[in-house]
Regions:
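Non-catalytic membrane-proximal stalk/linker segments that position and tether the catalytic domains
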Residues: 1-3, 232, 245-356
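Acidic donor-binding segment of Leloir-type glycosyltransferases
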Residues: 26-69
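Glycine-rich, basic loop-to-helix element that forms the pyrophosphate-binding segment
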Residues: 71-87
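Conserved donor NDP-sugar-binding/catalytic core segment of glycosyltransferases
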Residues: 106-137
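Acidic donor-binding loop at a coil-to-helix junction in glycosyltransferase catalytic cores
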Residues: 182-190
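A short, active-site helix/loop in glycosyltransferases that binds the activated sugar's phosphate group
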Residues: 314-321, 482, 486, 491, ...
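Aromatic "clamp/platform" in nucleotide-sugar-dependent glycosyltransferases that forms part
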Residues: 625
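Short hydrophobic beta-strand element within catalytic cores of glycosyltransferases
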Residues: 642-645
């Protein structure tokens, strides 16, 4: 078999006659090879090509140093690998069928390779995006950075394009991965793998790739389907955690990414040139360009770019450096940006193990959903001793109940650490974190951001993850005057149900509502009544016609209807009733909301129901715009307190009116609450009977043993 100095490998699929311009630029570049007496061959691989493309390339079939292949791989990675295996050149360059190269690319890159004293990969210095209705963007590529800095940049940014030249042996040693099922960007993976192996990426000075932006390219398809790269050893948390503080890539810290970068992101997000880079992750990088850096670069297009830009015009008349185009062309250096990597580095400090389960929640605070998570974790640990967990919080709130997490749990405060990143970068970062955790079991509880991530990455989840969710109820929307409802099952679960393995809930009512509303398969749901492990205390005894001390304990937020407490209190005699309100105020309720109401005594925040002096109270009043089976009802029952509750969601499954407690059927019926409170004052004895029945139900249905039995069926 004849050997060559260089193999020029062209990948094509459906470029049609556009490929003619590509081939003309290649043939112009080969003239420089011939001048230097560098032997070469041209291999053309048509992958799933259309007829126009196939017919066009037939004209080269009889050229002595051209070979044409046809296959149906449907992926750039296998196409490049095929060409590497067929190559007879000592060195090999990959080119795409719709781009153009400056006529010096082949000879300069070849010279850089043979002059290297170590194994290297060469890329063009400039990449100029062009195309119909596409803004020109000039990307300046730079050489490999010190390893730790390169890691931080590569974490969120593919530094080098897919157009390269290297020893054929290098490309055979590091074949492109065939990525499917939600994974993509084989060139990004190649760059990371070779960098991890210690191979330097260098630049062929003053060479340019003219990248034609088209909407039908496979690379654009990768961008539009939210595909990501798989786990990479180079980004392993343990390695990144060891980085020195001074290894961080240089970032202009005085520029607020939230104010500058996101402002620019919003300005350019709808422009076609976002996909300008030959590599898909460049879409991400343009979105975090900030004006601060660009002000110093606009108008300073390197002379070699202007020269080659004009020189290519006879081959492609769309390309010419008109003064007005030069003025508006933005310059971009992929090595400049590292915000994703910097944030990843901070996250890495919280990662101490490979988890068996990942929980994605908005926060870890004092709440029923948080207790559900804690119960699940405790049960899993009992079923599978030694299990490890990672909890990812997606809102920037303070996680006041982080102390309640099991010791074998890593808490990643993603919402706090990633605050300020534009949406695309935030999604890219979360994808990287989840992938690098190497855990296939994901569980979402009430996190809108996690649901949005799952919606974007359904193909990934379907093929590589086991996704379960917990959801408990729909609830009235206060702004609708309590006539409309919100629920996580629609749209969040409804949008992703094909990739959800199981929907856990704490009440049957929600299952019935969701099946009726959304036609979801009832088999998808699993009711797990939450356990109560508190000591069951004697039933509280209250004397008839004495002043009633009412306990109300919850977050003081509109969803818990604090306005109803005030309305109820205003209809009660302060000589006969006292309502003590416990709970931290949310931002949607004024902290002086209860001031001036004689019956109400605001007692401040509390740290779990067990911290409350329940023995001082006669009855629990519970109000809410929507619920499953609230944990506080179980806890109050265990404490021996009678319960008066609003009847919504699954509340009635535990508080059965005049059997295990007292219900107000219309949750906004002020007179209904007042009437029942007055009834309790007159007849507390019958409420003691309700508590006895409720405690019996508690022992039968809400025991830890019953909960573990249910958990074992799925975990």
């Amino acid at each position: 078999m004849k050997r060559y100095d260089l193999t020029v490998a062209v990948t094509a699929h459906n470029e049609g006659l556009v490929a003619h311009k590509t081939m003309r630029s290649i043939l112009e570049a080969t003239k420089r090879l011939e001048e230097k007496k560098i032997s070469y061959e041209i291999l053309i691989h048509i992958d799933n090509g259309d007829q126009i493309t196939k017919d066009y390339f037939k004209r080269y079939a009889k050229m002595p140093n051209v070979v044409i292949y046809e296959n149906n791989f449907g992926d750039p990675g296998p196409s490049r690998n095929f060409l590497a295996q067929k190559a007879s050149g000592e060195y090999l360059t990959f080119l795409d069928g719709d781009d153009l190269i400056s006529d010096n690319w082949l000879v300069v890159a070849y010279g850089a390779l043979i002059g290297a004293t170590e194994e290297v990969i060469v890329h063009p210095e400039g990449i100029l995006t062009f195309g119909t209705e596409v803004n020109n963007v000039l990307t300046i590529q730079t050489e490999t950075l010190p390893r730790e800095k390169d890691t931080i940049v590569l974490l969120g940014e593919n530094r080098w394009c897919a157009i390269l030249m290297a020893k054929t042996s290098t490309l055979l040693k590091f074949p492109y991965q065939h990525l499917t099922g939600g994974y993509s960007h084989e060139d990004y993976v190649f760059n990371v793998e070779t960098t991890n192996a210690g191979i330097k990426h260098i630049i062929a000075k003053e060479t340019i790739l003219f990248y034609r932006r088209s909407n039908n390219s496979r690379l654009s398809s990768s961008n539009n389907t939210n595909q990501i790269i798989p786990y990479m050893e180079f980004f392993d948390f343990a390695k990144v955690r060891e980085f020195r503080a001074d290894s961080h890539a240089d970032v202009p810290v005085e520029v607020s990414l939230k104010r500058k970068g996101y402002k620019l992101y919003k300005k350019i997000r709808d422009n076609n040139f976002l996909n300008y880079f030959i590599t898909p992750p460049a879409k991400l990088t343009l979105k975090v360009l900030n004006k601060f850096n660009q002000k110093n670069k606009l108008g300073k297009i390197p002379e070699f770019v202007v020269r080659e830009w004009a020189k290519i015009n006879p081959l492609e008349t769309q390309l010419y450096p008109y003064p007005f185009i030069l003025k508006r062309t933005q310059i971009y250096d992929p090595s400049d940006l590292s915000m994703i990597g910097e944030t990843y580095l901070k996250i890495a400090q919280s990662v101490t193990h490979t988890p068996d389960y990942i929980f994605m929640v908005p926060w870890v605070v004092r709440g029923g959903a948080d207790k559900v998570m804690l119960n699940m974790m405790k049960a899993i640990e009992e079923i599978h001793p030694g299990s490890k967990f990672t909890v990812i919080t997606t809102l920037p709130n303070k996680n006041v109940w982080a102390k309640m997490l099991p010791k074998n749990t890593d808490l990643i405060e993603f919402g706090k650490l990633a605050e300020g990143l534009p949406p695309y970068e935030k999604d890219e970062l979360l994808s990287r974190v989840i992938t690098q955790l190497k855990c296939k079991r994901l569980h979402i509880i009430n996190s809108e951001y996690a649901y949005a991530w799952a919606y974007k990455h359904q193909e990934l989840i379907k093929n590589h993850y086991e996704l379960t969710v917990s959801v408990f109820a729909s609830c009235f929307i206060p702004e609708s005057n309590f006539t409309c409802r919100f629920s996580f099952d629609d749209p969040f679960i409804f949008d992703i149900y094909p990739v959800v393995k199981k929907i856990f809930t704490d009440n049957q009512t929600f299952v019935e509502e969701s099946v009726e509303k959304n036609a979801l398969d009832e088999k998808l749901f699993k009711v797990q009544y939450q356990p109560i492990m508190d000591e069951i205390k004697p039933v509280h005894h209250a004397e008839a016609n004495k002043k009633v001390k009412v306990l109300w304990a919850s977050r003081v937020t509109r969803e818990k209807m604090p306005d109803m407490i005030k309305l109820i209190a205003n209809k009660l005699d302060p000589k006969e009733f006292q309502i003590d309100v416990f709970g931290a105020f949310s931002d949607d309720v004024d902290k002086n909301f209860f001031t001036g109401v004689p019956v109400i005594n605001y007692r401040g925040a509390f740290d779990g129901f067990s911290s409350l002096p329940t023995e001082d109270y006669d009855i629990l009043l519970y109000t809410s715009v929507g619920d499953g089976v609230p944990n506080i009802l179980l806890e109050a029952t265990a404490a021996g307190l009678p319960i008066l509750a609003s009847n919504d969601g699954g509340v009635h499954e535990f508080i059965q009116d005049e059997k295990t407690g007292s219900l107000v059927k219309e949750i906004r019926d002020v007179d209904g609450y007042v009437k029942k409170l007055k009834d309790f004052r007159k007849n507390p004895k019958k409420y003691e009977e309700y508590v006895e029945a409720a405690q019996k139900l508690l022992e039968e249905r809400h025991s830890w043993k019953a909960f573990i039995k249910k958990m074992k069926e799925d975990f």
